[in-house]
């Protein structure tokens, strides 16, 4: 290695410039890492919300045993939703604290490297390095004292990794505002009305339409449909809602599900989407039944007694209970 030949002052100046370049390079690396972490956190948002409904549905399914009333089911579903949202918020806060701790450890490692380098440098450089470290420590203490004492803070020092009560309270407040805004939008969508075309099925179809809000449950829909069907069908005059089934796209839908659940999850059945309630031609009657189309068919309102007698005959032989974990990404004709 070539030996530097010059005065002690020039050697100290050269070493100072080298340390300054190293510091700028480290700051650039920290900035790149922070940008990459923010990008990763933003990319995880959609995945969190897409997995949110499936996790709540799985928890509801595992915690419900036997027959329960509709009110108990709805209360349990809403409680699970609130608990899931609080867990996601807490997990996000823990992730942010973990990142802050990692940045703090990285800062300590950089200081340790600087300390080792300064031991090999000249006395002049050691004094300058000590003064710079003391200024950074004083700036960090001034930042932790609160916003009222920030007048003497060095604006060039990065203190984002330090704990800040006011910043955490502001983040929690913003997170709560976003949650309330999301709740308000969800309630607004639930209040929107949609026209549902269905067919009472007793071996042949008898088509009817009703208007329901998207937040209505399948049981509420069957109750409204039964009120209109009793006038025309004698076998329904003594029937109750619990004796009826709602079959959509060859799937038997549970009474406690809401239409909003299928819309948010964009759930699909064997022959079409469960989140669309307008009517198109049956895909099995088209020229090419293997072509997947975003088309919906009229759901069937059926007596359970009729289904038990005819479940070995088409079309009842195709019907099966709805399972949110089972995906029907392509149409089936068998």
UniProtKB/Swiss-Prot annotation:
N-acetylalanine modified-residue sites: 2
PANTHER family attached to this UniProt entry: PROTEIN FAM50B (PTHR12722:SF1), XAP-5 PROTEIN-RELATED (PTHR12722)
A Pfam family per the record: XAP5
Family recorded in the similarity comment: Belongs to the FAM50 family.
Keywords: Acetylation
Region called Disordered, residue ranges: 122-175
Tissue specificity note: Widely expressed. Abundant in testis, where it is expressed in seminiferous tubules, not in the interstitium. At the cellular level, expressed in primary spermatocytes and round spermatids, but not detectable in spermatogonia, elongating spermatids, mature spermatozoa, Sertoli cells or Leydig cells.
Species of the source: Mus musculus (Mouse)
Transmembrane feature ranges: none
Protein name: Protein FAM50B
GO-annotated cellular components: intercellular bridge; midbody; nucleoplasm
Record gene name: Fam50b
InterPro entries linked: FAM50A/XAP5_C, XAP5
Compositionally biased spans, kind Basic and acidic residues: 132-141, 163-175
